[in-house]
Amino acid sequence: MALSMASIKVAPAFGKSNLATRKSSPAPRRGSVTVKALKQNASVKHDSYNEHHGPEYFKYSGVDTTPDERQRRHTYYDKRTAIINQHFPGSIGMDDWLFRIENKLGEFGFTGDNTIAQTNFCRDEITAPLKNGIHDIFGYAMDIDGLAGFTAAGLTGLGAGMSHSPTDPNGRERYVFFAMPHIAVDSAGKPGDCIRAGRAGCSHACGALIKLQPKFQELKSGGMQIRAPGTCDHMDPEYSLLEARMLSAVQPADVPQGGLDLVQVTKLADSVIQKHMEELVRASVDPSKCDFAIVTGVQIHSYGHTLDEWHPNMEYVQPTRMTIVVNGQRTDVNLVEETPAPTPRQLWKL
């Protein structure tokens, strides 16, 4: 059952509205690469997080194989993408997303030379590939991360990042705020499951949102006491804040009888994070002195579902909102519909 989002109040707009709104073959074929199944995940290098890409990258990487092999490879990656889109429609590969983000922001004057990025992702280390991609575009970002992508940096944190921005000769500054929760959806399509480098067996993401899941059933039954706004557990501050924000975002009557599944919780988190980020930006940014953008979505980790078969670890993003304000003029961008995708060759070269 879909969750009603009617209780989530949409933040007022910034500026004036301008809506631009497999298994490896037993014997290798000539010209192909044989990949052996990994039996013991704990033997994987911990820094392998830097090697993840989206599906289009992997499609092109086998350009030296036979046509039949190439077709099988493309079919495999298309199936992986279809699995992700069953849960998060409109999702695209991480490389694809980064390419489009850089191009679209460049159209509005945001570049690595004149802009500072602020990243609000989950503290989980598997969010690193996406963050590294943003660093490649804008240089090192101001880190305002929090559990599940719920920042606790507040106005002081955002203000610190803005004070580090490059400045034009006329004194104008530019900021891009990235904010999103994350979720694992393994290669078989099971939400929440992933395999981590250096750790044998199955792991999960996002752990904070998985911990939160049962609370919605408690809320539905009337047995959940929501923490008062502005208060937190001093021994568990970030989780207690995200729990209060999430549970306050829905009415008990809107929660399905069986509670919320992890995909629903993640989508709700995206909505709540959007609202909170817009509130922070509105309270801290002066559009007369700077240009800025807010980019939200869901980061999705598509890793293998078994250690007995080889399945490449891939990263996806479901874009949900992109708001750009330049000289006080607001533009809402549909990233997928309005920004051309890179060619496979471009992705591979990048």
PLM features: residue spans?
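Divalent-metal-activated hydrolytic enzyme cores
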Residues: 41-116, 122-124, 139-141, 147-175, ...
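N-terminal mitochondrial targeting presequences
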Residues: 1-6, 29-51
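N-terminal, polar/Ser/Thr-rich
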Residues: 177-179
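Sterically constrained small-residue positions within well-ordered secondary structures
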Residues: 26-28, 110, 135
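Short Gly/aromatic-enriched secondary-structure transition segments
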Residues: 132-140
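Short N-terminal binding/cap micro-motifs at the start of the first secondary-structure element
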Residues: 127-129
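N-terminal chloroplast transit peptides
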Residues: 1-27
